[in-house]
Structures are given as C-alpha cells and as structure tokens.
C-alpha cells in the first residue's frame, strides 16, 4: 500500500477530452475526439506517476527509454528483450530511420558532425544549472520524411530550482511538449518514461527531483477506444507507487533494466485496445 496521496491528473485529462473534445479526422483514418492544448503537472515527490486505473506495461517503458538513450533506431535490440511496441512501424530490416534516439544522441550538423544532445544537457546541468537553454529536440525538420514515425513527444526542457537550505540539493524539473497525444494508449507511457528520465538525470547530476510537466498539442481519444476509456473512467485511482534506482552508474548511458524497481504499484487490470498505425 502506497503512502503517497491519490492523484488523478491523467484521469481528469481523459475525462476532459472525452467530454469536451470535437470530432476530428486523422492520418490513420480511425477518427478521434480531440482538444488542442492541455497541461498536467506531476510532483515526482508524490510518487512515480504510473497510471493506476489500468495496468501499464512498465518493462516496455524502461526498455524503450534505454533504447532511446543508446541512440538506436533498429527494433532488434528491443525485440531481443521481448519488447515489440515499435514493430508496427519498422521496415523489413528492423530499422525506423533517424527517430528519437538518433536525434537525441547524434543530431547531424551541416559540416558532417553530430551533436549528442543528452550529453550536452547533462554537462550544462552540472556546470550551468540556471541555464534556460537545457533543451533536447527530436523534431529535426530536415529528417522528418526519413522517419518511420515522426516524433510525437518532440521537445523537452530541464529546469533546476536552487537549493532552499545551505548544503541542500537543487530540484530538477522537466517539461515535455507532445505535439500528438494518443491519450488512452500512448500518454501513460510518455508520462512514466519522462518521469523516469527525470529521476535518472537528477541522480547523475546530484539533484533532487521536482516536477514533471506534460504539455500536449493535439490531444485525442481514438474512436475505437471509446469503450475502453469509459471502462477506465469508471475506476477509482490508487496512490502512485515509488521508484527505486538501485545503483548510480558512471553515466546516463550506463543504466540497465535491472537498475530500476517500482515499489507498491497497486492498479486495476490491463485494458486492451488497438493501435492506430
């Protein structure tokens, strides 16, 4: 049983879009109920924001984030570990083109070089934590047409609140801008993934965690998810669990799946739904 307060930011969001959204056609041909612009704030000191009104596949969230941090663009590494969440978009050889991990770790420069945005962000957090330029972008306009799927969670920024007591630690917050948000299937993954990343970066930079702020553009519920959403909204949320990171590796790129444990995850049963490809 978690000692954290019960929060329902995600469920309130899902209910808001289901109630106030407009019908909109979309690229997949499925149809959506959509609103434009929404924000949720999660205090990471109130628990790890893993949705509780349905069981969320935590293993896939952790593996996908580690895969991004590898700078990888081939699903083979994920498949070898039993994770198939990217298979629908992969080419026959498993490649996805220059997607998230490639842009995070090796954004191409005009002179033929590459920028490791994650390494640069960590370096700046350690040397100039008051910077307003600690940003990582996956939205590389010049390479969008080479990607199997254009970035949905496109851009994120870190912010350090100074220590409030002598000898205390600063607090690391992260804000994500997600241009396209599949609220039922995708957003629970995205919230947990960036909350996990914030914890990892905070550990590497000797900071405490602050808030994770999720900001969405086109926020939608697919028409073929309506029954699942109604079921989920009929359930009462539990308190969020606690994230434990068992060791501090030498760098942000050296974490392994076994380093993470979520304690006290009380949740309702999983709800299956089709993915719009």
From Swiss-Prot:
Its main subcellular localisation, reduced to a broad class, is cytoplasm
Give the lineage.
Answer: Bacteria, Pseudomonadati, Pseudomonadota, Betaproteobacteria, Burkholderiales
Which organism is this entry from?
A: Albidiferax ferrireducens (strain ATCC BAA-621 / DSM 15236 / T118) (Rhodoferax ferrireducens)
Q: What class of enzyme is it?
A: transferase
Q: Answer whether the UniProt record assigns the keyword rRNA-binding to this protein.
A: no
- What does the UniProt entry say about where the protein is found? Cytoplasm
Task: Spell out the protein name for this chain.
Answer: Thymidylate synthase
Gene name, per UniProt, is: thyA
List the GO molecular function terms: thymidylate synthase activity
Q: A Gene Ontology CC term for this entry?
A: cytosol
